[in-house]
Amino acid sequence: MKRIFSLVMAAAFFTAATAQAADVTLLNASYDATRELYQTLGTSFAARYAKSGDKITLSSSHGGSGAQARAVIDGLQADVVTLALAADIDAIASKAKLLPRDWQARLPHNSAPYTSTIVFLVRKGNPKQIKDWNDLVKPGVQVIAPNPKTGGASRWVYLAAWAYAEKAPGGNANSARAFVADLYKHVPVLDSSGRGSSVTFTKRGLGDVLLNWENEALLALKQPDGDQYQIVYPSRSILAEPPVALVDVNADKRGTRKAAEAFLNYLYTPQAQEIEARNFYRPRDQQILAKYRKTFPNLPLATVDADFGGWAKAQATHFADGGVFDQIYQPGK
């Protein structure tokens, strides 16, 4: 009987030890431009996490930020989301109730471990002499930008353009609306994501200027044909804060909460902040940011909270069905 009891206890101990050292796979639903970033962060985090005796794999799903939010709402079992803007995670919280509405308060800097901004990528020599936002609406200038209804960069682009026009001498909401309407008349195709627009501009050869994430523009310069492009920083842009969050319901269902929370906290560590900077995202760590000051120049930045009343208001006003973008965008005209 004692031998049977010992075998049972040994089996139970082995089972528990196996469970404790079980492989963990996290699914990260992210936006298109972060492919390279999260591949590197996933590898780095896995090596760090392995020291605890567990093996972890980060699997990422990428697409337009708005489309990714809808996928999670519709059932994509993401443990974490790393999206382009807070409104998309707010939608997951309000529509699917997969995480609490106060999710932004759970991590530093409103749950945004890095920032970016919107810049212009032009062709070598800047043949159209594009230097600022007002140059984008000159006759003959073709602008490449993603679709604000599906992507994340696209909504930052739209708001940066709006803020520029509204803050111009004599500017107001009406002049900003007219400027943005004129701007989108110069956009021949609206890709579903910022990465899609990068491909349209650099691989398909369409357009005179690409409006996109700073990190996408810097990445383009590092490609084999990077010498065919140059970055133009406009006179002012916008502070883009891509947030991250635990998807509580999914993580609890899959038993991955501990690993998922550890991963999100890891994004704020010096090791991860360095990786983020090397991948052309502006780190929150000021010492690390200072090391990359030549990569990330200072420029005046609008903010969603100060200039648009926060993401809930901006989303409802500009990007919801029937909002300002739907009112002003007239494809083919």
Region locations from a protein language model:
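Positively charged n-region of N-terminal signal peptides that target proteins for export
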Residues: 1-4
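Bacterial N-terminal signal peptides
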Residues: 6-16
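N-terminal segment of the mature folded domain
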Residues: 22-150, 329-330
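Short beta-strand->loop
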Residues: 29-31, 122-124, 142-169, 183-187, ...
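A bilobed periplasmic-binding-protein/Venus flytrap-type ligand-binding module shared by bacterial periplasmic
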Residues: 117-126, 241-258, 275-279
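Short helix-loop capping/hinge motifs at secondary-structure junctions, enriched
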Residues: 125-131, 150, 163-171, 250-258
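Ligand-binding pocket segment of bilobal, Venus flytrap-like solute-binding proteins
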Residues: 168-235
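Extracellular/periplasmic juxtamembrane helices and adjacent flexible linkers that interface
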Residues: 251-333
